[in-house]
Amino acid sequence: MTASPPATPATHEFFFEWGVHAIMRLIEAYDFETVLDIGSGQGEHARFFRHFGKEVYSVNLSGNADYVGDFNELALDRQFDVVWCSHVIEHQRNVGVFLDKIFAALKDDGILALTAPCHPRERLIDGHLTSWNAGLICYNLILAGFDCSRACLLQTFELNLIVQKKRALLTEQDRPIAPGATTPLDRLAPLFPFPVKSPGDAEVLEVNWGEREYELPPASYPGEIKVTSSHATLS
């Protein structure tokens, strides 16, 4: 009897419209188990996380999600190792409330991975209430409690940011940052991952990101992994 040839492992294909660099870096470089996927949409990011054995909890305004509704109004029953937030912040009417809730949803030392579109403020787009760059996103995160001094940033066709949850403190008083924009930038400067001053340039294209040739860890399923994006070419 002739032995059957071994089965060829499947090719697992993933297509990301947004967030490709952030999700690849997150899977490659960070150790975590649970993920809160805010604005999960069709679930492609969640599918990728699960392919690597992550436990994913999805949030969406409608559809088949673990938490259905406005994230700002949901009662979460746990904290998470990672909050994944891809192209959601630009839709928020209350950015401070949104980031405060993300901070509370993360475990101590948890990871926020956030992406947002980069388009000029002169351009008006359906549903996009804010326009972002590295300086503004870090400024808002610091006021929400995040120490961004070791954040990783990459601006391509979109802004990618990964930051660990470390509470932002004014070290000379060892106290949290006051709410609102009452603290001068020169005192907040140590909490940014790049030099800042007022007025200053907020367009920073890359900090602490490194090479864009991502080496993925072993997945939970055998076979080749193929990742494509309409906006980015991956090595």
Feature names for model-found ranges:
Residues M1-W84, F98-L99, F103, T130, ...:
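Conserved N-terminal segment of class I S-adenosyl-L-methionine
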Residues G53-K54, D108-G110:
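A short helix->loop->beta-strand "cap" motif at the edges of active sites that frequently abuts
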Residues S86-H91:
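Short catalytic micro-motifs in class I SAM-dependent methyltransferases
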Residues Q92-R93, L106-D108:
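Helix-to-beta-strand junctions that scaffold the AdoMet/dcAdoMet cofactor pocket
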Residues D109-P117:
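Conserved beta-strand signature within the Rossmann-like core of class I S-adenosyl-L-methionine
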Residues P117-E122, L153-Q155:
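Short "lid" loop at the C-terminus of a central beta-strand within the Rossmann-like core
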Residues F146-E158:
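Conserved S-adenosyl-L-methionine
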